[in-house]
Structure formats: C-alpha cells, structure tokens
C-alpha cells in the first residue's frame, strides 16, 4: 500500500503516520518544514516515545518525505492508495489545489485503482470539507471521474501529542500518550477499506465525532482556561486542582447528557469514558501547557466547536449547562502573548464589551439568557483577577 501523509508534525509522526507505517505502508510525509524533511530522508526512520504506566520507545521505519509544494507530491497522489492529513483546519484548504492536481494527473495516467483520502483533523467531517475545496479546484470535466474512483472518508481522531520537550536534540523524536482512537466512516470508502491496526470502521461516525468533541475537546479546553485563571502551568496541575476538576467533570457530564439523549449512549459506559479522559489529563509524563491547549479561543468559541456546540445541545434538549457556561466565560478570559486569536479577543472585548463579543464569536443571540449568564460569570472572573 502506497500512502501519502500531509503534515509531518507531531500528530503526523506520532499518530497517523505511525499507524500507516506499522501497517506496512510505503509512507511518504509531505510538509513545508525543510530541515524536518531532510532529516526524515536521511534517516528513513524516527522514534516515538509512548508514555503512560509502561513507557516504551517504538521505531517507525521505511519512511520518506517530500515538500508539499513540489511536483513530486502531485505524482505521489497520482500513484497512492491512500492520502491522509494532519495539518490543522486552517491549512487543509491550502492543500486542496495540490490534491486536485494530483487527481487530474491520476486520471491522465489511467490509474483507476481506488484512492481513499482521510483528513485526520480536529473538526467535524473535515474530509467532506476538503472534498468541497478539492472539487472547487477541479475542472468540471474531471469531477465525475473523481467521484467514481476517489473516496473522501470522514474520521474522528483522538490522541494527546504535546509539543517536543524544550532542549530535545532530536527533531524527529515525538512523545505520545498510550491511548489512541482513529474512527473512520466505513460507508465512504471506494473499494475495500485497508486493514490498518488502530483504524476502526463505523457506520455511525457522527456519534463518535461528537463524543470526542464534547468530552475530550470540551474538557481539555475548559481545563486549560480554568487552569490558566487559577495560575497553573500544565493540564495535569490544573486537573488535579479540585475546583477546576469539579467544573471540568461537570461540563463533560452536561455535554454527555446531550450525547445520551441524541445517540442513546449507555450512561454508565459514557461515565466510564469521562473518567478515562480525566485520567488522561492527569498523565504525569505529558507536560502539556495550558497556554498551548487554550490557543485559538475564537475558533474554540465558534458555533460548531467544543464549547458552543454542546451548549446548543443542552438548549435543544432543555438540559442543565452551568459548568459549560463557566467554561465559556473562562475561554473569554484566556490571554496569550503568543496567540494572534487571543490578541484579537482582547481587542474585541475592549471595543465591544463581553456581551457583543460573545454574541459575535459564537452566533448566540446577544439578548439570550445563556449569554447574560456567561457574561455575568466572565465579569465575576475579571473582578477576582483585579483583586
């Protein structure tokens, strides 16, 4: 199996790329970080530190790398059996043109073997969004052929992969937690789905996408935002603070009540899933900084993301949401000199005030009860910081 993976960052190397290589794929990474690409091509392998109760080092072998902007990428798409991405939602749109070129070349070469493309991003139905962007870049005459021979497979991915430790001398080494989950929509493949250990097929992907978004992502973000307010440096320090933990767990239970109602999840199993996630946040081997996890607050406060989407579910089913609201207020309080969205958030708050800012970012009606509630919690947080 020939596989091309866009994004040779920590998630690409430590999660998706690793599973593909472990499955025996002939794997090429595409990225723009030239020193990283040179090192991958020189060594053809790298090390993954899997940390948890039993830490171990696993070697990923037989890999190569190309620059995402090079003609080689187009040729690789024309020949691949599988294309995956872990580039972040913002960059996904930028690779659509390259993917479209590769598909046109594939058609010209008469390659009718099925190709499956899977975007492994923190977004809902990311591959379907990529497909729209690819089709916008395709000549109309090519679209029917692509529709027939290329599967765009949506997925849900979950593995905590913090940035490399400062002072680490090996630019290829990556640290990951033991837990990983890669769930793909089995109904969207062209041809037989490939056998890859660690990739699970489902015919009910949205349940898994929302379970992960409403639990792991919601919990992780709120831990970061409340952790920063309480003066904690890492996710572990924050989640071990009883006050933070109580709100985070409460928020995950509130979003969980939406999932139980919407997808008929087993309440006991979902409670166990929440406990599992809390224990992952406590992992002493993952030094995950609250400022990093809180990055991009405008995106995280948007209507389809980890804070507002579960809140909208509680409104739809008339369920409690006090802890989610506290999390939203904490997100509005996030500050970072390094993050452009944090800077923009501060400017919006100064210009519009909290009520209009939250309404603008989230799409919630400014005069709604829930916005009033979030603003009141936010103001109380700001008063506390001022004293």
Curated annotation (Swiss-Prot):
Pfam families per the UniProt record, alphabetical: Mannitol_dh (PF01232), Mannitol_dh_C (PF08125)
Annotated TM spans: none
One Gene Ontology term of the molecular function aspect: mannitol-1-phosphate 5-dehydrogenase activity
Highest taxon of source: Bacteria
Reaction(s) catalysed (UniProt annotation): D-mannitol 1-phosphate + NAD(+) = beta-D-fructose 6-phosphate + NADH + H(+)
Broad enzyme group: oxidoreductase
Enzyme Commission number(s) of this protein: 1.1.1.17
Sequence positions that bind NAD(+): 3-14
Keywords: NAD, Oxidoreductase
InterPro entries in UniProt: 6-PGluconate_DH-like_C_sf, 6PGD_dom2, Mannitol_1_phos_5_DH, Mannitol_DH, Mannitol_DH_C, Mannitol_DH_CS, Mannitol_DH_N, NAD(P)-bd_dom_sf
Any one GO cellular component localisation term in the record: cytosol
BP-aspect Gene Ontology terms: mannitol catabolic process
Keyword Magnesium attached: no
PANTHER family linked to this entry: ALTRONATE OXIDOREDUCTASE-RELATED, MANNITOL-1-PHOSPHATE 5-DEHYDROGENASE
UniProt family annotation: Belongs to the mannitol dehydrogenase family.
Protein name, per record: Mannitol-1-phosphate 5-dehydrogenase
